[in-house]
């Protein structure tokens, strides 16, 4: 059975990276100061902050209908099945748009995703491995939508500028938070970005969270792998070393997807412990 996989830029991959893996790619759109960029094509997480400035006016939107139809028309006859794994349906209209369009095609399956970033990549590598072992396509397709309750993903913005610009934090609240050195702690859980709590000082909060996570999962550490994602944080090596010391494993370091960085701003860091086999991590390191 010949299967095509389609991802979007919420995975954190560029079109070139996805294609090297043998996957197809749909860019989400990022508007910066009234100019639209195709994420993963016109910009990526390496040059994003050369374009996005502190006071930039920004917004994000789903892939264009024309681009989706063009891709689907191109690949539907070349494969027995097409699996499309978009950004979490709770964060964007991308899933709804794809699902409506896919109804016109017999072999295109849209995953009702609760994932983004490296979690999407992990799910797809596991899916490919299972299909390669002749597991049921329908059963493995269902697993792509499953959220693992044991995993924890926490996100901490270093600055509040992007939260203010995006209307997620008032200027008055941001000013008070700056004086008090309060930082928000956001969790990504079951496909949603939710408030987890708050801390005092970015560095203190992050090191404390790394220590807390490491302690919580220490008894089952052989089955979990540490991951750090960041938006060009200049002090990333410090947190990498802290995770290594606390958990006993060197974390995988990745960049936050641009469609997330536009809302969290420069310096933001996400940390996670994910239950995954080492061969999956090795594939991520090798290909991405």
Curated annotation (Swiss-Prot):
Pfam family name, one: DegV
Q: Which UniProt keywords apply?
A: Lipid-binding
Residue ranges annotated for the DegV domain, each copy included: 3-275
What Gene3D superfamilies does the annotation carry? Answer: 3.30.1180.10, 3.40.50.10170
Family annotation (InterPro entries): DegV, DegV_C, DegV_domain_contain
Q: Molecular function (GO) terms listed? A: lipid binding
* Residues that bind hexadecanoate: 61, 92
Record's function text: May bind long-chain fatty acids, such as palmitate, and may play a role in lipid transport or fatty acid metabolism.
Task: Identify this protein by name.
Answer: DegV domain-containing protein MYPU_3590
């Amino acid at each position: 059975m010949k299967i095509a996989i389609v991802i979007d830029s919420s995975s954190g991959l560029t079109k070139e990276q996805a294609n090297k893996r043998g996957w197809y790619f749909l860019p989400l759109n990022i508007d910066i100061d009234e100019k639209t960029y195709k994420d993963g094509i016109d910009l990526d997480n390496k040059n994003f902050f050369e374009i996005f400035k502190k006071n930039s006016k920004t917004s994000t939107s789903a892939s264009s209908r024309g681009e989706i139809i063009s891709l689907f028309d191109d690949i539907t006859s070349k494969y027995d099945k097409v699996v499309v794994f978009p950004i979490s349906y709770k964060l964007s209209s991308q899933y709804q748009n794809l699902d409506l369009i896919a109804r016109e095609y017999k072999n295109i399956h849209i995953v009702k995703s609760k994932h983004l970033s490296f979690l999407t990549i992990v799910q797809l590598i596991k899916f490919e491995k299972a299909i390669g072992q002749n597991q049921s396509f329908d059963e493995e397709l269902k697993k792509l939508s499953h959220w693992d309750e044991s995993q924890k993903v926490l996100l901490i913005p270093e600055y509040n500028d992007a939260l203010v610009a995006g209307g997620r934090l008032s200027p008055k609240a941001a000013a008070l938070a700056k004086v008090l050195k309060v930082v928000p702690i956001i969790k990504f859980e079951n496909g949603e970005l939710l408030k987890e709590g708050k801390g005092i000082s970015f560095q203190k909060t992050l090191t404390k969270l790394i220590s807390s996570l490491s302690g919580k999962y220490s008894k089952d550490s052989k089955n979990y792998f540490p991951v750090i994602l960041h938006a060009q944080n200049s002090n990333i090596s410090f947190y990498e070393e802290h995770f290594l010391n606390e958990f006993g494993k060197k974390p995988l370091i990745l960049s936050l997807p641009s469609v997330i960085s536009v809302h969290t701003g420069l310096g933001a860091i996400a940390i996670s412990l994910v239950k995954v086999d080492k061969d999956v991590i090795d594939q991520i390191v090798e290909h991405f």
